[in-house]
Amino acid sequence: MQLSPSEISGLIKQRIEKFDNSVELKSEGTIVSVADGIVTIYGLNDVAAGEMIKLPGDVYGLALNLNTDSVGAVVLGDYEHIKEGDKAYCTGRILEVPVGEALLGRVVDALGNPIDGKGEVATDLTSPIEKIAPGVIWRKSVDQALQTGIKSIDSMVPIGRGQRELIIGDRQIGKTAIAVDTIINQKGTGVKCIYVAIGQKASTIANIVRQLEEHGAMEHAIIVAATASDSAALQYIAPYAGCSMGEYFRDRGQDALIVYDDLTKQAWAYRQISLLLRRPPGREAYPGDVFYLHSRLLERAARVNEEYVEKFTNGEVKGKTGSLTALPIIETQAGDISAFVPTNVISITDGQIFLETDLFNSGLRPAINPGNSVSRVGGAAQTKIIKKLGGGIRLALAQYRELEAFSQFASDLDEATRAQLNRGQRVTELLKQKQFSTLSVALMALSLYAADNGYLDNLEVSEVIPFESALHALAETKYSDVIAEINETGKYDADIADKLKIIVEDCKANQAW
């Protein structure tokens, strides 16, 4: 086939028009060492701190050390195929994770990849794992209660929406049980929950997922899992990933709760990474910025005002405040709360729930020590009826603890002291609560009213829990309208007090326990 000169010139013109003369600029470096999940890269002069670096085999690294002529990065995934001499490239992006409603009911890893076998997460939205916390001007004071359903917490150490409340104690003492009960109690309240498991066994996480599913709580929960078999890098970034997922709800005028279980293991992972990166060790071999590790995470839990939500959503959501409540967990060694990481997190948070081994072993569960436990901002958020009735509980316990030690040395006690000891014993018994048996505001108020007004004083200590069960059963069947009214309003006045009195006296008269 012969082409005429005009056709040839036409083809040449077409080729010239289609010719792509764009230049692709890539910042390239060479891997000079790889060991223990840390790669050292020569070159990459344009890399930024916290930037993702593309490594061979569709694996990414996180730039943490920026030296004069090299970059120290931690590998996010498998690094066995990476070898000396391989090329690495800048991406110009910082690490992002998927966010959105589609994550509810799912179990994901620290990078947001699903690990529950239910297929891909149907969301296109992503968010950086590192964000600056809202400034003072965008915040609103904490004045809405976050009910845990646990008597000893809601009455003595109340938690508000947007608060950071530390749960601290030794291992195997019920820290996770409190967090799981709190997540279960948010069912039907509209509060979205994120549970971040750091450095736990996969079987333990599977058990928590099963418990949440059994109690219908997975519908409003996201599980972010960085198991003990995952790399230190994934255990380090998991809390930040979970926080970004919670901020999605906070910034859109909704309420969210995030549990970090536990931040001690995150600090261990960060210490491991820092030592491998040859950063100078400080106290307990932790790096100098271990305080900042936790402070920048926990400061992101906040209650934001209407203006912040309206600005963030470009006016789509108006007149709504958002909140992210954080329940960080810290594991102590033999009750030592003066160690480095516990003291750091105590100083960052708005209060702590201190669990004690001796109380746990004596059968008091949840094993909360009311003397060391405090809520710095939750009092303003406490439900009115619980605040009114819970004050007497704390006082009775404080007097009981003081007199209990004294009474061991005194043989003859006056009537008033004996009455205080009796009241304290019964209040202590009343605060015992089994796991997965959270209470509504009304039923909790009923129990507190009975204790406050001396209705438990003439019962045997062993009869307190059966009496409470009978009281709740009677209230839910015969006085359901009163229970519904208290749950709806949360107020306390003479009328409500009279109604509570009628219920308690009815139960006492029947002696149905």
Curated annotation (Swiss-Prot):
Topology term for the membrane: Peripheral membrane protein
Main location (coarse class): membrane
GO cellular component: plasma membrane; proton-transporting ATP synthase complex
Keywords: ATP synthesis, ATP-binding, Cell inner membrane, Cell membrane, CF(1), Hydrogen ion transport, Ion transport, Membrane, Nucleotide-binding, Translocase, Transport
Sites annotated Required for activity: 373
Keyword Cell inner membrane: yes
UniProt-listed HAMAP family: ATP_synth_alpha_bact
Role noted for this protein: Produces ATP from ADP in the presence of a proton gradient across the membrane. The alpha chain is a regulatory subunit.
Family from the record: Belongs to the ATPase alpha/beta chains family.
Protein name per UniProt: ATP synthase subunit alpha
Provenance organism: Francisella tularensis subsp. tularensis (strain SCHU S4 / Schu 4)
Native organism taxonomy: Bacteria, Pseudomonadati, Pseudomonadota, Gammaproteobacteria, Thiotrichales
Originating gene: atpA
